[in-house]
Regions:
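Helical mechanochemical/support elements of P-loop NTPase systems and associated helical scaffolds
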Residues: 27-31, 45, 56, 60, ...
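Signal for well-folded cores of large energy- and translation-related assemblies
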Residues: 36, 54, 65, 80, ...
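Conserved catalytic-core segment of NTP-binding enzymes
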Residues: 189, 224-303
Length: 303
């Protein structure tokens, strides 16, 4: 299993406190040396930061930002490089929909999504292709289902996994707009007709390996989800990506979410406090059990 990684955000306490940027500490290169190598900082600027650090203390990255030499996002990039972790580069972060940016920048939401990712790593995603597909479901609309699929997929990609997000919400799906995918890109039904075409999908982000396959207008339904063609597509992409996450229509709308869940064999439930119906959630649990679908867990959100 891969080591998990939290979303790297600028935190002065995470910056390397060392004085000599040339000497590694505990096997890690100094943050200042990495910044110079990346072209983010000039040697003269690094020396100025070190002079202040010697006299006043403080963290290297924090001081460099306070002096106007760096932006917080640049320190984040250097920290990720220091720890050999993938990170969401500033240009990619700016490309994301504002709702997703807000979700991953809010500590409460981020904690819920990170916990869900950890559960999936421990209980579901592994090297077996049949355990690489997951449906994200909710009882009704506006219960955070698409946001959950997007955020968990993003966090999984930040562990170094190759992630494919599939939008099975024909006519109402938002994954393409959340990640800035062009509408003329390969559609879900086209991929079902020719699964190998899905293997040529490119990452929507420059800094992480995350691709999106969306359903175009009115072209994917419960019958399509239950078809052998969709099962064949899932088997094909599960042999190529480490994690395949399928966003579904609301469970109460039609049978599509149930059919997708059965094909994926595992499901993650999105719950909105004060909005999701208890009887609806109970019905989902019963139907998942009857369909042989493993319920991996739930993400509880308040918004």
């Amino acid at each position: 299993m891969r080591d998990t990684a939290k979303l790297l955000r600028f935190d002065p306490d995470q910056s390397d406190p060392g004085i000599d940027i040339r000497q590694p500490v505990n096997g890690q290169r100094r943050i200042g040396a990495i910044m110079i190598d990346l072209g983010l900082l000039q040697v003269e600027q690094a020396e100025q930061v070190l002079d202040i650090q010697r006299g006043e203390g403080g963290r290297f990255g924090d001081l460099a930002v306070s002096l106007g030499f760096l932006r917080k996002e640049q320190v984040m990039v250097a920290l990720a490089r220091q720890r050999a972790l993938p990170t969401l580069m500033p240009d990619d972060l700016a490309r994301l929909d504002s709702d997703l940016r807000s979700a991953i920048e809010d500590s409460g939401s981020l904690r819920a999504y990170t916990d869900a990712r950890t559960q999936l790593e421990l209980r579901w995603f592994d090297d077996a292709p049949e355990r690489r597909t997951l449906a994200v479901i909710s009882d009704g609309p506006r219960e955070g289902r698409t946001l959950t699929a997007s955020a968990v997929g993003l966090l999984l990609a930040m562990t170094g996994r190759r992630v494919l997000l599939i939008d099975a919400c024909a006519g109402s799906g938002r994954l393409a707009s959340i990640f800035g995918v062009e509408k003329k890109s390969l559609s879900l039904t086209e991929a079902i007709s020719s699964p190998d075409r899905a293997l040529r999908l490119k990452s929507t982000l420059d800094s992480l390996d995350l691709a999106v396959l969306s359903a175009h207008e009115k072209e994917f339904n419960a019958d399509t989800a239950a078809s052998r063609g969709f099962a064949s597509l899932l088997a094909t992409v599960a042999g190529h990506w480490d994690a395949v996450i399928v966003d579904t229509p609301a469970w109460s709308v039609d049978r599509t979410a149930f059919a997708v869940s059965v094909r994926c064999s595992g499901a993650l439930i999105s719950v909105r406090l004060g909005h999701s119906r208890l009887d609806g959630l109970s019905a989902i649990r019963r139907h998942l059990a009857d369909g042989g679908v493993e319920r991996i867990g739930a993400v509880v959100q308040r918004f």
